[in-house]
Amino acid sequence: MKRKSVDSKKVVAILLIVVFSLVAILKLTTVFVSIVNYKINNKKWNDGIGIIYDQHLDNIKDYRYGFGTIGENGCGAVAIYNIMCLENKKVALPKIIKSMDNGQMFFGLLGTKPTRILSYLKKHGFDAQLHEDKSKFEALSQDSKYCIYIYVGKSGGHYSLLVHNSDSETFRSINPRGITTMSDMMEENQNKFINLLITVK
């Protein structure tokens, strides 16, 4: 009995339809979730909240972000919010979360894409650059007003906002709060899988 030959063009067409359908579903889901999250977050927002030094505080941690919360995966959005506060460009956290909701990794359960952070900063008038070469981090950081140090390791990742103390080589760390240097940050995270730096002027 002769076997029917498989029409490779039909197979490719079906696969493309499936892929494009999945992409469309993911996009629609992201948009829907961001709208729902914004409505929930906006109801609880208090304009009196200033700089956020800890995303795990009771009045912050339960804000919705993707399918998770700010306390779990919102360090990127918090870094953006804090820069806007420091620059007196007060933007409500729910608005920033809504913008970041379109740049999530796996519906926000893995945080925010660095490129989304970068595009947000540039859109709001900052000279922001993303760097991968760790050997240049120290020099680049000294020429920047703010830095966002990004690391990813076995136990997860974090976006740490660093504010340059212009009279020294030290930085004020926000979320978590403290004083550090770029060399200390690199040494502390030397065994992480990913180390990136966003410089902001």
Stretches with model-predicted labels:
Residues 2-105:
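Active-site-adjacent structural segments surrounding the nucleophilic cysteine of cysteine proteases
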Residues 84-201:
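Conserved active-site-adjacent core of cysteine acyl-enzyme catalytic domains
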